[in-house]
Regions:
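Conserved hydrophobic/aromatic beta-strand scaffold that supports enzyme active sites
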Residues: 78, 177-179, 195-197, 298
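Conserved Class I S-adenosyl-L-methionine
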Residues: 161-175
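Flexible, glycine-/basic-rich loop-and-beta segments that form/coincide
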Residues: 186-245
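C-terminal target-recognition/interaction regions appended to catalytic cores
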Residues: 245-326
Length: 326
């Protein structure tokens, strides 16, 4: 019998894919976004119930009923509450203080690092972490997997994570907190995520890396996958998309950026004879270009028109390429 799983905040089903690959039976997914629900329903590998719903309106009993499970049937719950309240943008120093500090440092001027306030910005979505816990408490699964961005560990966000962990431990769960790095598990992308692994039987063990940037020093570990390897064959004309063509204000600048570089290639700091930009005046991923010899940076969910990473051939990434890097 395969272990039943319920996926909360399911999105397009990333954790469901992982659970399925691990031999589990994903019985149900709960997701609020209608487009994501359609993606779940069209996934040929997925055969569970898709519920378009706000998790805060559901009970633990309703979750088990949705998955066709009785009160005492084995169950694991997985999910990642919305990350936006915990992302770097949510705790970055405001009013440009951080940018001024970094610019002064880059120019060799004396500067004092601004102090951040430890109060988090108001965002109701922060409460969804404990809604995830509430559903665990009410449905009483054998274990759980919770996922979020690394910055949920930031001092402004840590109390939310600790409240979850403390509640789980008081309820009898062994909890392991770990930082997962996609690049260490055969993915050509330097995406990192915090995971809480919970079990009522014994303390869960975090999976060991299979790949390493220092593979020559790590015995049996494989070398990390590069973007060039992951995207091999996808630069073919049959995969062309009109949206990949870059036009507009910074198109010529993008073409001059070397692989692995960003807008700083057009600064005096980088030795450009006719600099357009001053270093530390743009976000680091502005005009950012992939290096085919290295893993990709994390792909942004909703990038702006000049937000990278761009392909090293000075175009936007194609859908099949973004999928290959995920």
């Amino acid at each position: 019998m395969r272990l039943p799983v319920i996926d909360l905040f399911a999105g397009a089903g990333g954790l469901s894919v992982g659970a399925t690959d691990a031999g589990c039976d994903v019985r149900a997914s709960v997701e609020l976004d209608s487009t994501a629900c359609k993606s779940l329903e069209k996934n040929a590998r997925y055969h569970g119930v898709v519920a378009q719903a706000d998790v805060s309106t559901l009970s633990g009993r309703e979750l088990r009923n949705l998955a066709g499970l009785g009160a005492d049937d084995p169950l694991v719950i997985v999910g990642g509450a919305p990350c936006q309240p915990f992302s770097k943008a949510a705790y970055w120093v405001e009013n440009g203080e951080e940018a001024r500090f970094r610019r002064a440092r880059a120019e060799g001027r004396d500067s004092i690092k601004p102090r951040t306030k430890l109060e988090a910005r108001p965002d109701e979505r922060r409460n969804l972490v404990m809604e995830f816990w509430r559903l665990i408490e009410e449905s009483n699964p054998d274990g759980f997997v919770f996922e979020n961005v690394p910055s949920i560990r930031h001092p402004k966000n840590r109390p939310v994570l600790d409240a979850f962990i403390n509640s789980a431990q008081k309820a009898g769960y062994y909890v392991t907190e770990t930082l997962g790095k996609a690049v260490e598990h055969g993915v050509a992308q330097k995406r990192e995520r915090v995971f809480l692994l919970g079990s009522k039987r014994k303390r869960p063990m975090a999976p060991s890396p299979t790949h390493s940037l220092k593979h020559d020093e790590c015995g049996e570990l494989k070398p990390v996958l590069t973007t060039g390897e992951a995207l091999e064959g996808l630069d073919d004309a049959r995969y062309f998309e009109p949206e990949e063509v870059v036009t507009g204000r910074w198109a010529d600048h993008l073409r001059e950026v070397p692989p692995g570089g960003n807008y700083k290639a057009h600064t005096a700091w980088a030795g450009h004879p006719n600099p357009t930009f001053v270093t530390e005046t743009r976000f680091w991923n502005f005009l950012l270009k992939l290096d085919p010899q290295k893993p990709s940076w994390t792909l942004a969910a909703s990038p702006g028109p000049w937000t990278g990473p761009f392909h090293w051939n000075s175009r936007r990434l194609r859908t099949v390429e973004m999928a290959a890097l995920q």
